[in-house]
């Protein structure tokens, strides 16, 4: 398989060759990591933690190397593409002229369909290659890598939560399962709305109309609480503060470039840990849950 892929890469342009080589290097690194995991006993927590940190470092180094390679190629490609396009155009013009002089062949409908299909396939491959560059250099990828490294140092990893407006509540619902608590998203929303509504004086000073900058009126406050309970309104720090009081549990929010935010520090016990991602989706901020890194390590090593 490797041989045929290399031959295919050689037939493509520089970008396709680079992307395919980088994919191969990723597979080779994953194979190496798997070997490292298999060499460490599952019950050796200290070495498992060291392994997790080393794996995160190896992956980050490879991603940085790939990013630099893609950046250099992207900077070098535009001028070369112009030269290639001109050369291809001249060659095609000369070839078509000779063919017309010789026999004036007719192109069948089937041939036109095949050519159109080939052109669409080429365009699709170019879009995929561009997406590969964006995935390796974009803010979303860099944020994911940084958060993965921060969590790996704590023997944790991101657990994906759907982006549907309920992400913060779904992430807390997921975390509560570890606390043997069966609260649903609907229950969490209803309790949050009730708590904020009953603590009007504590929350109102932090709620302002985005258009006027004025503090919410009583009607706006009522609508705000109703939206929490009955819509997919996105939850933020005020809702987290309310939930920490409702659950009497500290809630920690891990983020990329700032220290973790902890609400409900007055409560003891195991904190609920959420991951705040600014670039995860085009619509904006998103919350994910976390899980023990050993879950994935054990599965891969078994």
From Swiss-Prot:
Region described as Disordered: spans on this chain: 1-52, 99-121
Active-site residue list: 164, 167 (nucleophile), 286
Region spans: His-loop: 276-286
A biological process from GO: cell population proliferation
Keywords: Hydrolase, Protease, Thiol protease, Ubl conjugation pathway
Compositional bias of kind Acidic residues: 1-10
Catalytic activity: Thiol-dependent hydrolysis of ester, thioester, amide, peptide and isopeptide bonds formed by the C-terminal Gly of ubiquitin (a 76-residue protein attached to proteins as an intracellular targeting signal)
Pfam families the record matches: OTU (PF02338)
Region described as Cys-loop: 161-167
S-S pairs: none
Example of a GO MF term: cysteine-type deubiquitinase activity
InterPro entries per UniProt: OTU_dom, OTU_OTUD6, Papain-like_cys_pep_sf, Peptidase_C85-like
Residue span, OTU domain: 156-293
Reported function: Deubiquitinating enzyme that may play a role in the ubiquitin-dependent regulation of different cellular processes.
PANTHER family noted in UniProt: DEUBIQUITINASE OTUD6B, OTU DOMAIN CONTAINING PROTEIN
UniProt-recorded name of the protein: Deubiquitinase OTUD6B
Annotated organism of origin: Gallus gallus (Chicken)
Gene it is expressed from: OTUD6B
